[in-house]
Amino acid sequence: MLTRPLLALSRPMALGALRPAVLVRTLTTAGPTTTVRSTPIITPSHLSTLSRSTPFVSNCTLSLLKRSFHVSSDARSAAKAEGKPKVSAYEKANMRLAKIGVFFQLSWYLGIILAALGLFGLVWYYLIMELVMPSGDVRIFNRAFKEIEKNEDVMRVLGGQLSSMGEGGGGRWGRNQPPVSKRGIDKYGREHIWMNFYVSGDINEGRAKLELVQNTDSKLSSERFVYRYFVVDIPGHKRIYIAGNAAEKMEKKKSTGWLGVNWGKSDDE
């Protein structure tokens, strides 16, 4: 007589143990109507909880539950397999080609960025070397032109409103080019800089020649290079010495050769 009440009491307990089970919703379409059914999925943890909490459930009931668990697991696996889209070989090839295209596109953009950075660095290097450093051609030319404007002899022969031009190797086009220097190292390790350019005024036109030599004794940037000679040659006039060696020293070098001839190449050529 006690068996039935105990079995009756065990059903709510079993149902309570099955409450945390996962619900699987199934859509069934029949004509214009769609039916949604929720089916509880029993996991192994639920079976172990059920066996511990309801000792009066028969082995037959547990076996039925286990069987239903396996069936529900198979149904869930089949549902996942059906829900996952199948990718064909053609689509996989297109995906690989798309990835390759993105890779090359990013590589192209990266190359453009690196090239722009390199060009920016070259521009900055040119600005620093030519405009800031005392050994730059622009700094040397500006310094020499200011020295010419300060010289009274040059201004008297050339006239006012001085203008400068390039070395003039290629006619008018060559004279319109900015002055370019030539550089070399002597046997003492000092750097030498040579520069020639034309200077014209209202009256005449002359050619300026200069040589700078590295001053290893001075640590000042303004005195890093000193004039070895700086002269201006004007047709029909004597050579005018702007800076560097004194006039008598330059004349002495020209007249102290053997038999009155200066052997070798002159420094101002």
From Swiss-Prot:
The chain crosses the membrane at residues 108-128. InterPro entries: Tim21, Tim21_IMS_sf. Residues 1-76 form a transit peptide. It is a single-pass membrane protein. It is found in: Mitochondrion inner membrane. Pfam families: TIM21. The keyword Transmembrane helix applies. GO terms for biological process: protein import into mitochondrial matrix. Signal peptide: none annotated. Residues 77-107 are mitochondrial matrix. GO terms for cellular component: TIM23 mitochondrial import inner membrane translocase complex. Residues 129-269 are mitochondrial intermembrane. Component of the TIM23 complex, at least composed of TIM23, TIM17, TIM50 and TIM21. Belongs to the TIM21 family. Essential component of the TIM23 complex, a complex that mediates the translocation of transit peptide-containing proteins across the mitochondrial inner membrane. Required to keep the TOM and the TIM23 complexes in close contact. At some point, it is released from the TOM23 complex to allow protein translocation into the mitochondrial matrix. This is Mitochondrial import inner membrane translocase subunit TIM21. The gene is TIM21.
